[in-house]
Amino acid sequence: MLMTTTTIAMSLSHDVIIAAAQRAARAIPPLWPLASSVAVNPFLGQASEPLEVAAARLRRASGIAVTMPRSWYAERLQSGEITEDDLQAAFQTAPAARRPPNVSALKHAIKVARPAPQAIPTVAELARDVTAIDWPGIVNERIGHWAAGYFDQGQALWAVGQSGGAYSTWRIIATHDLTPEIAGLAGFSQSVSDAPATAEDALVDCVARLGLSPDALDGYFHRLLTTLGGWGQVARYRLWQAELNGGTDACVTDLLAIRMLWEAALLHNGGSALVPGWQSAIAAYAAPVAASSDDVVDSILQEAAERAAQRKLNTVLAAPSSARLSRGRLTLQMAFCIDVRSEVFRRALESLDSGITTLGFAGFFGFGIGHRRFASDVVEARLPVLLSPGVVTCAGEPTPAANAAELSARITARAKRAWGRFKLAAISSFAFVEATGPIYIAKLLRDGLALARHHAPTDPAPRPAHELDLDTRLTMAARILKAMSFTSNFARLVVLAGHGAKVVNNPHASALHCGACGGYSGEVNARLLASLLNDHQVRAGLAERGIVIPADTLFLAALHDTTTDAVTLFADDHPSPTHAQDLAQVTQWLAAAGALARGERALRLPRANRSQDIAHRARDWAEIRPEWALAGCQAFIAAPRSRSAGRDLAGRAFLHDYDWRCDHGFGVLELILTAPVVVASWISLQYYGSTVAPERFGAGNKLLHNVTGGIGVVEGNGGILRTGLPWQSVHDGERLIHEPLRLSVLIEAPTEAIGAILERHPQLRALFDNRWLHLFALDDEGRMARRYIGDLSWETYVGDASSQSNRASTLA
């Protein structure tokens, strides 16, 4: 017996259904391909609602919890890490109508395990329960098999054509795929053949066949997209990129239509046995999303854990600083990315000499570029993913010698690609190992024993593909220096350090690079800025604008390898014999700082008994934790460096230099809040999601990963595309390395200025109002003075009341 199409479903208009599909598309996050992967907030579609409501929504859509098990909070309460005051303060922030009657009741609730989260069932899941056939697994396997070819970015030798869109391409393949019918879904190929020709019409048809009510559409569509795992997010990425360039993309709608055709066919095939369960599911999808009392309890516990961490952070910032700063002219100023990994190296470097100071700025250094590497036609977007490239750059000067070198490199690259395809081809691959295996013995031994050596980037110095006029260069230089709060007191040597990570056998290698550079290493942007600021015409123009750079100041670019803490200086870009002694001294300092940083990081890395083990890990094919990347991140501080210098923040804080007294009109503050803070929130929440819900927001086990399509990874031989971070990125095998805490943003600026910016940017304000981020204003001494409580309101922050003598000096 088939489900009778209801009058309500038949009356649903095309526009109503498509609008619901578009809303569902925005409820899931995008997924960037592996070559340029960046951290993405998995809760991007839920930023407009608080944690407890998002928990209710994602439980229905994905069957997950978005906070840690209650035992995790109970342990912290018992150890004293979470205090009674933290619990009481968190309790007061919860809506009075839904929280427990008092803190005693809350403490009792901690001892009671919350119910296991259950998603509202799909037709495939109901059919599995009735027939004992794993229909959800079959659906995921068949869609994944097709999607791996359709979305392929060069890995497959025989790529699936993309003309006509995802829906049309899938129909062509599905009408010839007998797997569903062999599994028991009779007539599936014919039903696909008979389906409407367009995805939108197919959606409308399936809504009627499934008997969906208007109120059920959003929840059901969201549920289906989550069952697709990373494939839905790849389609969402396409929509993101299209909208960034002023267009649109229908791939998410196509995938939703594909998934709904499976649902409609399964309902038709299941007959009356599925009707009662499906009617109950429709009613559940149509019910309003509302937080349960358990959701509110979990939200309060999460808030309490974060308040405990904030109290500890305030103690560190309020403690006396051990920093020593020269009263004369500085010898070295070194600008780093705000990435938390830089904090360890910066602290180590500054400890070596009072003539050294460091700065923090977004790692793309204000250059929003699309860069074409040497001997490549691929334009890499080396800037935050929230932005579009404004300048196209390339490597090397257009000289005859450079052109000849590029041609030679292109020929070599083509030969390597041809050889690689020959190795993987359907016929030649069988004989390849037997015929050429001995040739690879030396390489296999070298790589297998981690004897290979990493080499610094060798691309020629980058330049704009089309020469920029002086006024444009001047405007760029002034804007960047002001954004860095770096307009005076220049040292003889200023080093601009981008960062990257050199690892082997790691599909997620780009995730270890600079997020502000779009998942690429940051040396290109740093080299461009150094060239710009060494330009004599630019310096003369800057002086007329009040930014005087001494004639003996030299800007150099560098690359900080976050895996080994080695630093490469690009001194040959701007040779200066008069700075030879300075460079020799700086080289020694960088080597010493690297040793200190490696020693500190070795304490956290498993099986890294000595700092010398760090470099070996970067070359080891079998190493699943070459570095901890941004695990542990919990704070973003925008203030003068003096507020954090000499204080051990344990590699857990993003540090952005900012002096509001020099920011007339607060344009720089607005830029910080709308760009670096948002990028940092994406990073923080990706780590949070991969920790609290690894089954949905994590990439699974690295040991089982197979790269598919050059896009992402699957576990084993197929199925859904995994997203987020591998479990080994947040867990050391015995305990969690990343504490799942929402980011605390600390800004030294007047609250009136911060509030005005939040009022102008509703999406940014929603992150703070719904406490996906915490916001604090620092006073003139760098202490946490005011807490943002939502609705453009602030309260006085009362931190640790203990005496200065009892204060800790580290955040670890």
Swiss-Prot record:
UniProt: Zn(2+) binding residues: C337, D339, H499, C514
GO MF annotations, alphabetized: zinc ion binding
Pfam families recorded: DabA (PF10070)
Localisation per UniProt entry: Cell inner membrane
Lipid bilayer topology: Peripheral membrane protein
Keyword hit for Metal-binding: yes
Superkingdom per UniProt: Bacteria
Cofactor: Zn(2+)
Keywords: Cell inner membrane, Cell membrane, Membrane, Metal-binding, Transport, Zinc
InterPro entries: DabA (IPR018752)
GO cellular component: plasma membrane
Entry-linked HAMAP family: DabA
Role of this protein: Part of an energy-coupled inorganic carbon pump.
PANTHER family (alphabetical): INORGANIC CARBON TRANSPORTER SUBUNIT DABA-RELATED (PTHR38344:SF1), UPF0753 PROTEIN AQ_863 (PTHR38344)
Family as reported in the entry's similarity comment: Belongs to the inorganic carbon transporter (TC 9.A.2) DabA family.
Known partners and oligomeric status: Forms a complex with DabB.
Record's protein name: Probable inorganic carbon transporter subunit DabA
Organism of origin: Xanthomonas oryzae pv. oryzae (strain PXO99A)
